């Protein structure tokens, strides 16, 4: 049984399915609170020809609002 399970699912896929199922089962009040836990914010800098260019920030919550 374990061999068949490993053949079809990686642990990452299994964890993704479990977390998605739990999120779908939550009450609406809690769902809104949980959605914000997945947001990511970070800074990144592009490099070109060995020189640093402008540093930019990224916020997944703001980019999701634009869509």
From Swiss-Prot:
Biological source species: Schizosaccharomyces pombe (strain 972 / ATCC 24843) (Fission yeast)
Keywords associated with the record: ATP synthesis, CF(1), Hydrogen ion transport, Ion transport, Membrane, Mitochondrion, Mitochondrion inner membrane, Transport
GO molecular function: proton-transporting ATP synthase activity, rotational mechanism
Localization: Mitochondrion; Mitochondrion inner membrane
Name recorded for this polypeptide: Putative ATP synthase subunit epsilon, mitochondrial
Chief location category: mitochondrion
GO cellular component: matrix side of mitochondrial inner membrane; mitochondrial inner membrane; mitochondrion; proton-transporting ATP synthase complex
Gene name of this polypeptide: atp15
Chain's role: Mitochondrial membrane ATP synthase (F(1)F(0) ATP synthase or Complex V) produces ATP from ADP in the presence of a proton gradient across the membrane which is generated by electron transport complexes of the respiratory chain. F-type ATPases consist of two structural domains, F(1) - containing the extramembraneous catalytic core, and F(0) - containing the membrane proton channel, linked together by a central stalk and a peripheral stalk. During catalysis, ATP synthesis in the catalytic domain of F(1) is coupled via a rotary mechanism of the central stalk subunits to proton translocation.
InterPro entries attached to this UniProt entry: ATP_synth_F1_esu_mt (IPR006721), ATP_synth_F1_esu_sf_mt (IPR036742)
GO biological-process terms attached to the record: proton motive force-driven mitochondrial ATP synthesis
Pfam families in alphabetical order: ATP-synt_Eps
Family of the protein in this entry: Belongs to the eukaryotic ATPase epsilon family.
